[in-house]
Structures are given as C-alpha cells and as structure tokens.
Curated annotation (Swiss-Prot):
Keywords, comma-separated and alphabetical: Aminoacyl-tRNA synthetase, ATP-binding, Cytoplasm, Ligase, Nucleotide-binding, Protein biosynthesis
Recorded GO CC terms: cytoplasm
Species of provenance: Prochlorococcus marinus (strain MIT 9313)
The keyword Chloroplast appears for this protein: no
HAMAP family attached to this UniProt entry: His_tRNA_synth (MF_00127)
InterPro entries from the UniProt entry: aa-tRNA-synth_II (IPR006195), aa-tRNA-synth_II/BPL/LPL (IPR045864), Anticodon-bd (IPR004154), Anticodon-bd_dom_sf (IPR036621), His-tRNA-ligase (IPR015807), HisRS-like_core (IPR041715), HisRS/HisZ (IPR004516)
Name of the coding gene: hisS
EC number: 6.1.1.21
Stretches of the chain forming a coiled coil according to its record: none
GO MF, one annotated term: histidine-tRNA ligase activity
Cellular location(s): Cytoplasm
Protein name, per record: Histidine--tRNA ligase
EC class (word): ligase
GO-annotated biological processes: histidyl-tRNA aminoacylation
Amino acid sequence: MTQLQSLRGMVDLLPEQTRCWQAVESVARDHFRRAGLQEIRTPLLEVTELFARGIGEATDVVGKEMYTFVDRGDRSCTLRPEGTASVVRAALQHGLLSQGPQRFWYGGPMFRYERPQAGRQRQFYQIGVEYLGVGSPRSDAEVIALAWALLVDLGVQGLVLEINSLGTLQDRQKYREELVAWLEARSEELDDDSRKRLYTNPLRILDSKHPAIKELLQDAPTLFEALSVESKARFEEVQVDLEALQIPFQLNPRLVRGLDYYGHTAFEITSDQLGAQATVCGGGRYDGLVEQLGGAPTPAFGWAFGMERLMLLLEAAASINPSGSAARLRASTRPDLYVVNRGEQAERVALVIAHQLRAAGLVVELDSSGAAFNKQFKRAGRSRATWALVIGDDEAERGEGRLKYLQEAKTQANPTPIDKLHRLDDVTGLVCLVRE
C-alpha cells in the first residue's frame, strides 16, 4: 500500500520545531500584551466575496492563488489567504467599531496556491496586528515600532525598514495614468507578466523581481512625485516620529503592497541573512477597507509576518532562546499604565515615553486618538489600567508628566488619590513608582 504523504506545500511541524515556534509566539504575545492589544480569532473559511471585495479582484492573490470551492449549500467559499479582511469583517459583524478604537492581534494558518520554496508554503502561518479606528500619522509610527521592537527582541539580524507613501486614492489614480503612459511607450521591453498587469494592476509592476524590469523602472516616474501636498506632509510626520523613536529607515519610492486596500504609509522590514534581501514583515495603512466591506469610513493600520521565513532567519542567526523568552511572560493582561496626551508636542513626547516604558517591561496603552482629555480618561478607565500618565503641551515643555492612580486610592494609609508630577526623562524611577 502506498504511504500517504502531506500535500505539496502543506508542511508538518514536528515537536522540536513546534517548541521553537511556541517560543516566538510567547515573545510576540508578551509584546502585544504590553502594547494593550487584544487577541482575535477568525474562521479559516470565509465567503469568497470577502476577499474579492477586500483584497481586490485584479490582485494575484484573488486571481491566481486562492483555494476556492462551492460548498453543498451552493456558496462560494475560500480558505483565507490573509488575515486583515477577516478581522475587519468580524469587527463589523459584532459591532466592535462602535465601541471606539480597537487594537487586535491574530495568529494562524493562511492558504495560497503558489510555488512552494524555502520560507514560503501553500499553508503558511502568519502573526499580525490591526489597529482600527485610529488615523493619525503617529499611530503609523507606533504600529511600525511594535513590529521593529518585536523582531529586534527575537534576535533577527540584518534588519532594514523601508517605507513609502501610497497617498490617497486620487493620488494613486493620477500616478496610475502617468505610469501606464510611461510603460506603454516601452511596452516592447516588458515581460509577459508585466504586460498582463499593465491595464489590470500596473502598480504591481513596480514590485517585479525580473532583473530587466527592475532596471527599466529605475527611470520610471515615482508615486511620491504624484502625491498631494497633504499626503507629503502626512508622510513627513511619520518620518519625524520614527526618528523620535530612533528607528532607522530608508525611503523606497518603488515599494508597493500586493493588496488593493493599502494607501498612505506602506512599509516592509527586510533582512539579508538568507542571502538575498527577504521581506520579514510588511503592512501599512488601509483606511478604505472597512467602508469597502460595508462599514462606515474608518482609519486602519496593520502588518503581518510569516512564521516560516522568520524561523529560517532565526535559525540562520542561531538566536532562538525559548527559556529566556518564556521567563518574561506575565499572566495579567491589565495595562500598568495608560498614556493620556493632547497637543502636537505632547503627542510626540507621549509616543516616545510609551515606547521606552514598554521596553522597560511595563504594559502601556497609548491613546493616539487626539481626543479631548475627558474622553481619553474614560478610555483609560475602561482599559482597567492601574495608572494614567497625563501629558499636555505644558507638561511636555517642562519634561514632566502627571501620574494619576486610577484604581481605588482612598485608603486609611492614603486618604487622598495619588496625583503627582514626574520627570519624563527618569524612566527607571517611573517604572519603579508604577510597580510599587
């Protein structure tokens, strides 16, 4: 009798490999917990329309790579090829967006019918983050910083962060016309794949791996040149915030994402540890997706990384340490601190201090909404955080923050609520005070 084998591109994880995966998952969970994210789990199987509407029918994912079938109820069903559309669908279906901004993370298998190779399988595992309802450039930097800090903590070597702005839909339509006209004049130099994409999804030609196409595109107009003044100003704010966080980055005007829902900030984190520069993590802003799926216009930003490629990088760097990772975990999901902030200078200072306090081990939730202080305090109360750190422009100017105890403060030993100023440059002292 013929021995049964797993399907091509569907790989077993044996116990030794599983232990390594669990170590990575534990570190990721710890980072997400400290950033105030909540886990969400969605079905592997969705109606095909979700991905056709969300990802875009002209994309390679929808056109070539999805596992789709008609079930016994005569419905077209698809094994999820990515996680974002499912998370947004769940948030809409259960009315979560009516409760204010939502911060989710997820992990699980995805499915795409593509040629299997090292670090790429037909069933692959992704871990991702989705921030729904927050539209500030500062939140872009915060979410990118979360990905960067996680990969650095895991020990991935040779990391490079590349960023670009895809602008608004109007910006991209303007650029699409310019790019198509430029490529039409050089159609004889295009390969077959690029010719197919020229009128269906021309921006994806910018992501071509064909050496001749990459060389041809060196002289092509860039999307950045087509951006509006407002889009350029927004992108500049993201760069300033990344610099404030001391996260190195490179501008890549050719960087595009493979899914239609992206706009404004897009990014990829790559590593050269496997020889060629390989993408470890990618994502960006997708403000139009919620509306495309039937909701109200809602800003959103997210990213995901593939576990298979990440594990290859960790093996190459010999940097996986399960016992060290597991030792840092703590059971509680209650934030230690909720950062309330308002004002241009205060928001940037708050972004930096939240990043520093998370690095020091605190569970910190940063309010990036720019809402009035009273609304932020209501959210702080709902978060069940022990403390609130309040930073306005006046406090930021003085390098101070007001620390408020949010739990029951009136006791015999302490009859009045704790409300004190603290130097923001004294991170160690702030951590000690919060942990008292």
